[in-house]
Amino acid sequence: MAQDQKPTVVITGASSGVGLYAAKALVKRGWHVVMACRNLEKADSAAKSLGMSPDSYTLMHIDLGSLDSVRKFVTQFRESGKSLDALVCNAAVYMPLLKEPMRSPEGYELSVATNHFGHFLLCNLLLEDLKHSTHNDPRLIILGTVTANSKELGGKIPIPAPADLGDLSGLEAGFKAPIAMIDGKPFKAGKAYKDSKLCNMITSRELHRRYHDSTGIVFNTLYPGCVADTPLFRNSLPVFQKVFPWFQKNITGGYVSQELAGERTAQVVADPEFKQSGVHWSWGNRQKEGRESFVQELSEKVTDDAKAKRMWELSEKLVGLA
């Protein structure tokens, strides 16, 4: 990479929350950010509100709930002629109040379609672009969550149920109506979200296992802390949106601001101390600025290699890669 050429990072869901503040933090580090979002007007307004220079970011449309939209994004990105030096899979939908599943254009339950299938396809398609990066340290980073890791307290909470892919029978059967859960069981909206994030963490680990040694690309997940006032919770009950941030700030002490979470994400993307691949970074779910990062142990639901391999194969089939 030429000395005067900025490295380029694609961030999904960069119009608000952690993705937006990660974009800001990476721009400060000298990166050019491709803000991959559904609402480009919203993304542009948000970037300007944080003082990001118009030449420091590029807006590109993507709807991760549509596999066709993901493919169109990849085509548009390649036509732009930009290098790809890092990919941050941040966007997510969380719809805990649904009684019946919403469906993607392909007929898949929407939270799994958006959070897992969309990012799974994006990662696989852009892997070739990352391989050709001239940056000395290309990385692919996926946002994880405490609720998908049963090694942590947040991952044990049975509301509505802990993350668990079961025997993957829902994927095995094609994951279309009436099926709406990866394990093939009755629909539970909150669990569908947790399962999708568990898939994200498995995907990152599989990417590392399959491609790190041959490409040098760093594949990691992170949990930047409990961002209790993130727009992710916009589809929750209004009382939850008011009480949850207060509870995390005043009772658990686990609250982390959107800005600090974005800064932590940028660290994992760009800073040299995060070059280790195949791990899950955490800060112990605390706001404290000086808190040290550490590699968080993951549960057997993530580290089961046989199930991970099968989940990968089924996901390839369902997104049209196999």
UniProtKB/Swiss-Prot annotation:
Keyword terms, alphabetized: Chlorophyll biosynthesis, NADP, Oxidoreductase, Photosynthesis
Enzyme Commission number: 1.3.1.33
Gene3D superfamilies: NAD(P)-binding Rossmann-like Domain
InterPro entries documented for this protein: NAD(P)-bd_dom_sf, Prochl_reduct, SDR_fam
Listed GO MF terms: protochlorophyllide reductase activity
Pathway assigned in UniProt: Porphyrin-containing compound metabolism; chlorophyll biosynthesis
Highest taxon of the lineage: Bacteria
Catalytic activity: chlorophyllide a + NADP(+) = protochlorophyllide a + NADPH + H(+)
GO biological process, one term: chlorophyll biosynthetic process
Family: Belongs to the short-chain dehydrogenases/reductases (SDR) family. POR subfamily.
Function (record text): Phototransformation of protochlorophyllide (Pchlide) to chlorophyllide (Chlide).
Record-given protein name: Light-dependent protochlorophyllide reductase
Organism annotation: Leptolyngbya boryana (Plectonema boryanum)
Gene field: por
